[in-house]
Amino acid sequence: MRIGTLEYINSVLTDELEIPYAFMEWQDDPPEAYFVGEYSEGDTPEEDGCQEITFIIDGFTRGSWLSLEKYKQKIEQNIERTAILASGAGVAVFYGNASQVPTGDADLKRIQINLTIKEFKNGR
């Protein structure tokens, strides 16, 4: 996954959708609900330069399930988009699915949101 794509996802989630989000780990005191992202790349890019990536956003709260579901709905309704990054590479983002994940802690709630990201190299 390119740095530009990570920066793009961060900008969409935090600036546009106003979701409390960080990549890989939350480093400050956590708000009531917050989200952390990570990714898994496919084996190799296709001949056309397209690489498909699974981007996982985990949401956590000690509050209500409803707060996580509201953020999930916001992501689901607003995340699908395409863009040309500053590098000239293209990116397409698609909502996949979501599921509640047991944490083993009765107070801590977790939701996993799966996105599919397609990166297209710019020919450079």
Where are these regions (language model features)?
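A broad, low-specificity signal marking well-ordered, structured residues that form hydrophobic/aromatic
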Residues: 33-35, 55, 113
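Extracellular/virion structural assembly segments
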Residues: 48, 60-80
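Short C-terminal domain-edge/linker segments immediately following a structured domain
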Residues: 54, 65-71, 86-92
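Short, charged interaction patches at domain edges and termini
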Residues: 1-11, 40-52, 91-124
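Small/polar-rich, solvent-exposed N-terminal microdomains that initiate assembly or binding
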Residues: 1-45, 73, 77, 82-87
